């Protein structure tokens, strides 16, 4: 790890499906840095969960696991981050105390074969954003989600190459998004004090409805 980042990066093992683990991660972060101003819930999985195949019906155990990681894990993070942020001093003239960001997906709005659980989990993330933004507005904490399309990430790399090639070909820009482009979107959501209660797409005009 680069020497210049050693005091700015802090790693804590955490199973996001366990509320106590998430609380511990938040507590340790506050212990290390004093407080939290930005929290990004980005742990997630996209395990295949077809509704019905020749091998049988929907695997509800896998469905439950996807929901636990993608939805409950995000909710736990937001719960404990909000407690910390509510005690912060305002960081600007608008009185802002913190920003909570979720990672949604274009799959929340568009059908993908075999992704019943993933689509449901990201739809749940979109559904969390507005009520949470309204609940936390009184504490001057903003809440938003970012909904990426196809990105060059380890998760995307697990797809068969022919699927990756087809997805890239169907994107008007002819390529997946870059991690740096997602990072820029995160920075934009943090810096723009009027982004609140929304899920913003960053997808290069990709549409998944025919897949």
Regions found by a protein language model. Name each.
Residues 45, 56-76, 101, 125:
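Catalytic Tyr-X3-Lys loop
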Residues 175-202, 207:
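C-terminal substrate-recognition "lid" of short-chain dehydrogenase/reductases
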Residues 83, 134-135:
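Alpha-helical segment proximal to the catalytic Tyr-Lys
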Residues 137-142, 195-198:
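Short, small/polar-rich loop/turn modules that mediate ligand/substrate recognition or access, typified
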Residues 46-64, 83, 87-93, 114-117, ...:
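Conserved mid-core segment of classical short-chain dehydrogenase/reductases
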Residues 105:
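Residue(s) in the substrate-gating loop at a strand-loop-helix junction
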Residues 78, 121:
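Active-site helix of classical SDR
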Residues 110-119, 131:
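Active-site loop-to-helix junction immediately N-terminal to the catalytic Tyr of the SDR YXXXK motif
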